[in-house]
Amino acid sequence: MRSLVVCLLLAACALECTARLQNVTVKGVAVCNKKRLANVEVQLYEKDTLDPDDLLDTKKTDAEGEFSVYGEEDETHAIAPYLLITHSCNPSKPNCVRIGRYLVPEDKIGGTYDMTYVTLDIKVHGEKEKCQ
């Protein structure tokens, strides 16, 4: 039993030693019906397989609808970042918000992903709606 614990500790240390710090910046402009949208929540997450996804950064769009989020994570494999954008552009019912998920391309890791205009009036695959 003791040797099993030692082996597990050594394996955990080996994984930690091979982890490397990776980062990404994502920027863009939130628009709804061709108008820039202020005060939209933009969250940058990093997908994990075995444990809950890591929230790396949260920002609100400014008065011009612009946002920029940055995150970094130590991982043994390539990070899998994505954005959750929560907004009230064309919900199906009053008092509801839409939550869209946007994947960050793998080739943008270590740099900046400029989404330019994020058209929130167009529904994205897997989008959710939350009503109060």
UniProtKB/Swiss-Prot annotation:
Keywords: Glycoprotein, Secreted, Signal. It is found in: Secreted. The keyword Mitochondrion does not apply. GO terms for cellular component: cell surface; extracellular region. InterPro entries: Transthyretin-like, Transthyretin-like_sf. Residues 1-19 form the signal peptide. Its main location: secreted. Belongs to the nematode transthyretin-like family. This is Transthyretin-like protein 16. The gene is ttr-16.
